[in-house]
């Protein structure tokens, strides 16, 4: 499964949900007629989105399976995913792009070749995306995923090169 969004809460009284999409285009999730929801990434529940509207950076979604606010409230925090087989196939070298889930576990080095850590996750801040890096000592560091910092993503060698010092 590839996670493409997160339910942030209910909307209205008819079972609609508010969703933060992790897709390049805000309405990219709506390209998929079937979604899988999970609160633990182990067991998945199939749902069918029937309509949506865009509200700022959020999607307001109607799901066929939910018709009241009480039931929809239980979905807060759940992840929205689709099977990888439903996503467009990308080149292995990453030149056509990559999915966030493919970056988890990749090594991060700076432009001097020094190992910084491994990608533990990514998240969106509104201003830009952020890499969550697991450092060798167990601590985490946040690195902005912007062109000025991320110099290269090499999917073949599973390495991201960043313009970042070890002591930032």
UniProtKB/Swiss-Prot annotation:
Cell location: Cytoplasm
Recorded GO MF terms: ribosome binding
Pfam families according to UniProt: PRC_RimM, RimM
Coiled-coil ranges (or none): none
Any one of the GO CC terms: cytoplasm
GO BP field: ribosomal small subunit biogenesis; rRNA processing
Keyword Chaperone: yes
Assigned keywords, A-Z: Chaperone, Cytoplasm, Ribosome biogenesis, rRNA processing
Domain PRC barrel stretches: 95-168
PANTHER family to which the protein is assigned, alphabetical: RIBOSOME MATURATION FACTOR RIMM
Annotated function: An accessory protein needed during the final step in the assembly of 30S ribosomal subunit, possibly for assembly of the head region. Essential for efficient processing of 16S rRNA. May be needed both before and after RbfA during the maturation of 16S rRNA. It has affinity for free ribosomal 30S subunits but not for 70S ribosomes.
Notes on the domains: The PRC barrel domain binds ribosomal protein uS19.
Subunit text: Binds ribosomal protein uS19.
Family affiliation: Belongs to the RimM family.
HAMAP family noted in UniProt: Ribosome_mat_RimM (MF_00014)
UniProt-recorded name of the protein: Ribosome maturation factor RimM
Natural source organism: Nitrosomonas eutropha (strain DSM 101675 / C91 / Nm57)
Taxon lineage: Bacteria, Pseudomonadati, Pseudomonadota, Betaproteobacteria, Nitrosomonadales
Gene that this sequence comes from: rimM
